[in-house]
C-alpha cells in the first residue's frame, strides 16, 4: 500500500516552509507529509490558526505556531523577526479567493458598494503574499487560488504574479489541477503558481496524477472553455499531466466515507448534538486503500468530528431523495409530503391560515428556479462535487448519500482528504468553513513532491 499518511521524517536538507493565508493548514500539511518542516504561518481567522497550530506544531511537541494576525497590518519584518535568516525558505499560501470566484463576486455584489470595495481590496492580497515571499528571498514559492483568477477585471492574476517573480530572478509557471487526479474524493479544480529561484533550478516537474476518471464519470476538465483564451494567451501556463490509463480510478464518496460511523440512519429518530471532540466507533474496519490512509495514524477505533446540522424540517425530505437528486427533486418530494399531510389532517387550500402554517412546516421556502443546485444528494459511486466555505451556513449542497442528513464535519474532512487524526476542536460552523476553504492535503502533497524534485534536480 502506498502509505501517503505514514509518518515522514523531516528532511533537514530541504528548505523550511512558511505558510501564509494558511486557513486550517491543508496546504502546509501536504508539505509536511512530503518531508518539509513547517516553520510558521499566519492566518486572520482565529479558529483556523488555532487548528493549524495544534495539528502542525503543538501535537508534535514543537513550540512553533501559526500566528493569528492580519497580513495587511503586520509588516514582513515583524513576522520574520524570530526566524534564522540563514535557513532557506519555501513560502506557500492561498490568498482568499472570494474576490475572484464567481460565487464570491455575486455574493458581494448583492451586498452593496462598501462590500464591493472590500472585494477589490481582497483581490490584491496576492501583493501582500508576494511582499512576504520576496522579503526573505524565498527559494521556492507556491500560491493557490481559484481558476477565475485568470480574469479579475481583465487582469490575469497568475500571469501577473509570474511576471513579477521572473523579474525578481525566479523561474515561474502556473497550472490548473483537479484534486480528484491525486486521490482526493472530490472534483475540485484549483490554480497553482509554482516558482523557484533560477540559481537553484527550473520548474521542470509538476504533479503527477495518481488516479484517473473511471468510465461512469464524465471528466471535469481542468481546461474549462471560459479559460481557453487566457490559457492560449499566457506565457506561463503549463498543461497539467494527463492521468495514465493504468492508474487507479478516482476515489468515490462511498470509498471515502463508507467506514465512518452511522449517525442518523432513520429520519424520525432523535437528533444527537455531538461535541467536536466526542468520539464514536467506526462502522467497520477500513475497506479500501483510501480508508486505510485516512486511519493510518489514528491509534484508536473511534473518530471525532461527528457533528452534523439539525435540519429538523428537512430530514423526511432527505429520506426520500435519491442519490444525485437536487433541489427540484427535493421540492417535489416536499409537496408530496404536504399533500399527504393535508389529506390526513383535513386541511385544504381554502383554510388559508392552517394551510400556510402546514406548508411552512414541511416545504422549504427556496425558489425552484434559482436554487436548483442548492440541495444535492451525493452519489456513492462518484467523487463529490467541490466543497465550499458556505458549508459553515448550511450543508444542503452536500447531503449524505445513505443517511437522511447533511454530511458531518469528519465526512467533509474525508472528502478533502484530511486524515482522521487531524482534529477540528472548534464549533461546527468554524470547522465546515475551514474545510471548505482548504487545499486538500493529498493534492498539496503532490505539489510538494514536485517542488522537491525541482529543488533536487529530479533526484529524490
Swiss-Prot record:
GO terms for biological process: DNA restriction-modification system; methylation; negative regulation of gene expression via chromosomal CpG island methylation. InterPro entries: C5-Methyltransferase, C5_MeTfrase, C5_meth_CS, SAM-dependent_MTases_sf. Its EC number is 2.1.1.37. It catalyses: a 2'-deoxycytidine in DNA + S-adenosyl-L-methionine = a 5-methyl-2'-deoxycytidine in DNA + S-adenosyl-L-homocysteine + H(+). Belongs to the class I-like SAM-binding methyltransferase superfamily. C5-methyltransferase family. A methylase, recognizes the double-stranded sequence 5'-ACCGGT-3', methylates C-? on both strands. No endonuclease has been identified for this methylase. This is Putative type II methyltransferase M.OihORF3336P.
Amino acid at each position: 500500500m502506498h502509505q501517503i499518511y505514514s509518518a515522514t521524517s523531516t528532511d533537514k536538507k530541504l528548505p523550511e516552509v512558511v505558510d501564509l493565508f494558511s486557513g486550517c493548514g491543508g496546504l502546509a500539511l501536504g508539505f509536511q507529509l512530503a518531508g518539509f518542516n513547517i516553520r510558521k504561518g499566519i492566518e486572520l481567522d482565529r479558529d483556523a490558526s488555532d487548528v493549524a497550530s495544534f495539528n502542525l506544531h503543538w501535537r508534535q511537541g514543537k513550540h512553533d505556531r501559526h500566528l493569528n494576525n492580519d497580513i495587511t497590518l503586520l509588516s514582513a519584518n515583524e513576522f520574520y523577526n524570530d526566524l534564522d535568516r540563514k535557513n532557506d525558505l519555501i513560502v506557500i499560501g492561498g490568498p482568499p479567493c472570494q474576490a475572484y470566484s464567481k460565487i464570491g463576486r455575486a455574493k458581494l455584489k448583492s451586498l452593496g458598494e462598501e462590500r464591493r470595495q472590500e472585494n477589490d481590496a481582497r483581490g490584491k492580497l496576492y501583493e501582500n503574499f508576494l511582499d512576504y515571499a520576496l522579503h526573505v528571498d524565498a527559494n521556492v514559492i507556491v500560491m493557490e487560488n481559484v481558476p477565475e483568477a485568470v480574469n479579475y477585471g481583465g487582469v490575469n492574476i497568475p500571469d501577473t504574479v509570474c511576471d513579477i517573480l521572473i523579474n525578481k530572478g525566479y523561474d515561474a509557471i502556473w497550472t490548473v489541477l483537479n484534486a480528484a487526479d491525486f486521490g482526493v474524493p472530490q472534483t475540485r479544480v484549483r490554480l497553482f503558481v509554482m516558482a523557484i529561484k533560477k540559481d537553484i533550478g527550473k520548474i521542470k516537474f509538476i504533479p503527477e496524477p495518481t488516479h484517473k476518471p473511471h468510465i461512469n464519470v464524465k471528466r471535469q476538465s481542468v481546461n474549462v472553455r471560459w479559460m481557453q483564451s487566457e490559457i492560449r494567451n499566457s506565457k506561463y501556463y503549463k498543461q497539467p499531466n494527463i492521468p495514465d490509463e493504468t492508474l487507479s480510478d478516482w476515489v468515490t464518496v462511498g470509498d471515502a466515507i463508507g467506514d465512518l460511523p452511522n449517525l442518523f440512519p432513520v429520519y424520525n429518530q432523535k437528533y444527537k448534538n455531538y461535541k467536536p471532540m466526542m468520539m464514536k466507533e467506526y462502522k467497520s474496519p477500513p475497506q479500501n486503500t483510501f480508508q486505510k490512509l485516512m486511519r493510518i495514524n489514528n491509534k484508536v477505533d473511534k473518530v471525532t468530528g461527528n457533528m452534523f446540522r439539525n435540519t429538523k424540517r428537512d430530514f423526511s425530505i432527505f429520506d426520500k431523495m435519491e442519490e444525485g437528486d437536487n433541489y427540484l427533486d427535493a421540492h417535489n418530494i416536499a409537496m408530496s409530503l404536504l399533500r399527504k399531510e393535508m389529506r390526513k389532517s383535513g386541511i385544504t387550500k381554502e383554510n388559508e391560515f392552517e394551510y400556510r402554517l402546514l406548508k411552512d412546516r414541511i416545504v422549504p421556502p427556496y425558489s425552484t428556479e434559482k436554487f436548483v443546485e442548492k440541495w444535492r444528494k451525493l452519489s456513492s459511486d462518484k467523487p463529490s462535487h467541490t466543497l465550499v466555505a458556505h458549508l459553515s451556513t448550511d450543508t444542503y449542497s452536500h447531503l449524505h448519500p445513505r443517511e437522511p442528513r447533511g454530511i458531518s464535519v469528519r465526512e467533509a474532512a474525508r472528502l478533502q482528504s484530511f486524515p482522521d487524526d487531524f482534529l477540528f476542536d472548534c464549533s461546527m460552523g468554524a470547522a465546515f468553513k475551514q474545510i471548505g476553504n482548504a487545499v486538500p492535503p493529498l493534492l498539496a502533497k503532490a505539489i510538494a513532491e514536485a517542488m522537491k524534485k525541482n529543488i533536487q534536480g529530479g533526484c529524490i
